[in-house]
């Protein structure tokens, strides 16, 4: 799914807010979001009815990279880049260092490309806050080698079998044969 801003990564909400499953017209299976993007974030989101795959993709021991495009206010200094790529403690947890590059920079701000290998709650926003950066827009653009590839915002598609196989292989245990 290409999750739009303004939707919760949940199946229901007791406060009546829109949920990503509201966008799944014609899907009869009970599916659940894999991981999360906060209410004001957008981008690629996997939903599944496969509990084993969901557990593999969300368990911390499986480090499948997720790439984000992060638009921040202003120019990003070398010092701020160093903070973002250092070992930070967020909410009492040491987080894995991220891969980071500047995609573009202009008068409206800087676009960063960040690769994360774990997904703590609001991790990118908290990392940027630690570096004194204000996030203007946050989009997840890939999960491993899965990309949106032109999928319109608010739309979804079924994964191809080779994509499901890739996710299982990318998250397999060392002693497990797929």
Where are these regions (language model features)?
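Basic, flexible Lys/Arg- and Gly-enriched helix-loop patches that mediate nucleic-acid binding at interfaces
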Residues: 1-178
């Amino acid at each position: 799914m290409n999750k739009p801003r303004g939707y919760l990564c949940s199946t229901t909400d007791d406060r009546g807010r829109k949920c990503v499953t509201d966008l799944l017209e014609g899907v009869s299976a009970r599916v659940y979001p894999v991981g999360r993007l906060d209410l004001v974030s957008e981008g690629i989101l996997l939903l599944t009815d496969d509990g084993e795959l969901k557990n593999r993709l969300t368990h911390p021991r499986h480090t499948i990279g997720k790439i984000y495009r992060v638009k921040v206010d202003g120019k990003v200094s070398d010092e701020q880049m160093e903070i973002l790529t250092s070992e930070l403690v967020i909410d009492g947890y040491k987080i894995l260092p991220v891969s980071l590059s500047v995609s573009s920079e202009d008068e409206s701000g800087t676009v960063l490309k960040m690769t994360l290998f774990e997904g703590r709650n609001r991790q990118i926003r908290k990392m940027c806050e630690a570096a004194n950066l204000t996030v203007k827009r946050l989009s997840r653009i890939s999960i491993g080698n899965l990309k949106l590839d032109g999928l319109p915002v608010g739309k979804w598609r079924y994964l191809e079998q080779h994509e499901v196989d890739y996710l299982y292989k990318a998250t397999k245990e060392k002693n497990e044969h797929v």
